[in-house]
Structures are given as C-alpha cells and as structure tokens.
Amino acid sequence: MKNLLSMEALTVHEIEHLLGQAAQFKRGKKATFTEQAFAVNMFFEPSTRTHTSFEVAEKKLGVEVVSFDAASSSMTKGETLYDTLLTMQAVGVNVAVIRHSEENYYEGLENLDIAIVNGGDGCGEHPSQSLLDLFTIKEQFGTFQGLKVAIAGDIRHSRVANSNMKVLKRLGAELFFSGPREWFDESCLAYGTYLPVDEMVEKVDVMMLLRVQHERHSGTEAFTKESYHEKFGLTIERAAKLKADAIIMHPSPVNRDVEIADSLVESEKSRIVTQMTNGVFIRMAILEAILKEQEMRAKLCTY
C-alpha cells in the first residue's frame, strides 16, 4: 500500500489484511523495520482522536514523529501543500498524515515518494476512521455479511458516512439511513434505505451516530440541540428498543444530549470508547503496511 487516500482504493483483501494486523497489534504484536522511519502529522483542521491516535500509533511502532504546526509553517507565506510535502520528502520523512478542509486535496500529490495518509478531507472521506469502525464491528460480530447497520445524523456533511456507506455495502452489510431530510443526500439511496429513526432502531445491529457538524452549516440551522435530540437523536426511550445484542457507535467528538443521550455514551451497548482504543491499532496497521511496502520497493531498487 503506497498511500491511503480513500476506502474505494482498497480491495476487500487489503481491508481484511489491515483488520487482521490491527487485531494482532491489539494482542501485543511488535513491528520491526530495517531502517528508522519518520512521520509528520499535518493537521489543517482541529482534531483530537485522529491526531493523537496516529501519534501514539507512530510511537508504538518506533517511528520518529516530526513536529509540524500549520500556523507557523511556510504555508502561511504562500507555500503550496505540494512544495511543503516535497520538503518533507527531501529531508527524509517517509509518511505524512494529512487532515485538510478541502475535499480531494491529495489530487496531484499521489506521485510524490512520501506516502500520504488521508486523515480526513472536508466532507469527502475519512479512511482510517472507517477502518477502525470496521475493526470494532468485526470484533463484535465476526462478520459484516447480513448485518443491519444504521447511519444516523448529519449525513450530508459527514466524511465518515461517505467512507462507511460505500465499504459496508461492499462487505455485505444492509444499510439504513436516518436524520433530517435537509441533511441527507439522495445519492446515498444507492447504498441503503432511508427510514424514520423510530422505525429504524428496532431493526439494526449497529447504530452508528454522526455528529451535527455545525462548522459546515451556513449558520441557519433548523434545530435547537433539544429539538434535534427529540426528533432524531438516540434518546433513552429509543435505545430501549434496540436489539439485545445491538451496539452503539459514534466517530466522536460527541455532542451529548444532541446525537445521543448523555447516559448512553458509556453504556453497556456503547462501543464509542472502544472505537477510540481501536483507532490506535488500526492506524498502526496502516502505517506498517505503508512502511513495509517502502522497504520492499527500496530493496528492489538495490538489485
């Protein structure tokens, strides 16, 4: 794997391999590389979980983390992202994890020697989040085939929804969508069925909630926090209708008492904290796959 830019670029075999490697890392597997590797985390949007779990993953792998602060970089002087990455490549950085507000920011960067991991591109995709979600689901159910998965909330503005709906359908899951119609893109119907939340909760094995992305709205939102929770959120009453073995997921950050009732965030059915934990192991698997391929290509070049 040279880069990780989108879920669509991964084959089912590659996905299964990454999930298997993540499981091994969770059981204590150690990675070894023939040469010292360097990574840089370039975040142009706020992040807590993605940024910190990539850094923890890098350090667990023995990868040196190169500091980067967008606000104090030469990009504030007009340097392009391409030239910034060219610099990182020139000084010996192996992989760049990038979070950016622009969708498809990585177009035109793929042919650089430095590997690129998409840490989220606007409303586009979030492949490492999607992979950790898959890892969490597989840990619970052992398969994706035939699972009923709900994606509920601010779907139109969610890169997580965009990644997950495509890959879950490929893996054999049945998808359901819910949330405000004005925040729903009809193109999603190619992947699943839209249902009112009260009808959906009784059907699904996985209830995947999405954050209301206030920063991507025009500022004229139609709902107060209280009205959103009442109409579309996972309330205590709705959660009581979930199947006995159903799980609750959320990519975080969570708006408590908006998408989900406060007391449900750390409840028995919730896998929200587990998702955060699993993020480290799946990101270790991603980085290992990229760095091992770099080692293999370097070895071939010596012959």
Curated annotation (Swiss-Prot):
L-aspartate binds at residues 77, 159, 211. PROSITE patterns: CARBAMOYLTRANSFERASE. Its EC number is 2.1.3.2. GO terms for biological process: 'de novo' pyrimidine nucleobase biosynthetic process; 'de novo' UMP biosynthetic process; amino acid metabolic process. GO terms for molecular function: amino acid binding; aspartate carbamoyltransferase activity. It catalyses: carbamoyl phosphate + L-aspartate = N-carbamoyl-L-aspartate + phosphate + H(+). The keyword Transferase applies. Pathway: Pyrimidine metabolism; UMP biosynthesis via de novo pathway; (S)-dihydroorotate from bicarbonate: step 2/3. Keywords: Pyrimidine biosynthesis, Transferase. The keyword rRNA-binding does not apply. It is an enzyme of class 2 (transferase). Catalyzes the condensation of carbamoyl phosphate and aspartate to form carbamoyl aspartate and inorganic phosphate, the committed step in the de novo pyrimidine nucleotide biosynthesis pathway. Heterododecamer (2C3:3R2) of six catalytic PyrB chains organized as two trimers (C3), and six regulatory PyrI chains organized as three dimers (R2). This is Aspartate carbamoyltransferase catalytic subunit. It comes from Listeria monocytogenes serotype 4a (strain HCC23).
